[in-house]
Amino acid sequence: MTDLEFMDRAEKLLLAVEQSCDRINDTTDADLDGQRTGGMVTITFRNRSQIVINLQKPLHEIWMAAQSGGYHFRHDGTSWMDTKGAGEFFAALSHNATLQAGQALQFTD
């Protein structure tokens, strides 16, 4: 994948995360605060815990830091998959957000 392809796919992912935060706030009482700064999105939950998603352009990876740990994702041609086998990005984000929010939350691309 070229740098341009990575940035195109990665920007789409960050936009989808932002849009999911807006949708979740419109349809639940989760009260997520999603803040975008350059190539990073920080999601802050009501309990002040955070999930941070950021681009690692030199590695063509997206990193996610949650209370449960750190995750690295690479695009496999179809989806962003965890480099250590923990699954697809939006499934991992939904799982970690659910744990940190204390209620079921679904992030989608």
Curated annotation (Swiss-Prot):
Gene3D superfamilies noted in UniProt: Frataxin/CyaY
UniProt keyword list: Iron, Metal-binding
Single GO cellular component term: cytoplasm
UniProt signal peptide: none
Pfam families, sorted: Frataxin_Cyay (PF01491)
Molecular function, one GO term: ferric iron binding
Transmembrane stretches, start-end: none
Listed SMART domains: Frataxin_Cyay
GO BP term (any one): iron-sulfur cluster assembly
SS bond partners: none
InterPro entries: CyaY, Frataxin/CyaY, Frataxin/CyaY_sf, Frataxin_CS
Similarity-based family: Belongs to the frataxin family.
Function: Involved in iron-sulfur (Fe-S) cluster assembly. May act as a regulator of Fe-S biogenesis.
Record protein name field: Iron-sulfur cluster assembly protein CyaY
Source organism of the structure: Acidovorax sp. (strain JS42)
The encoding gene: cyaY
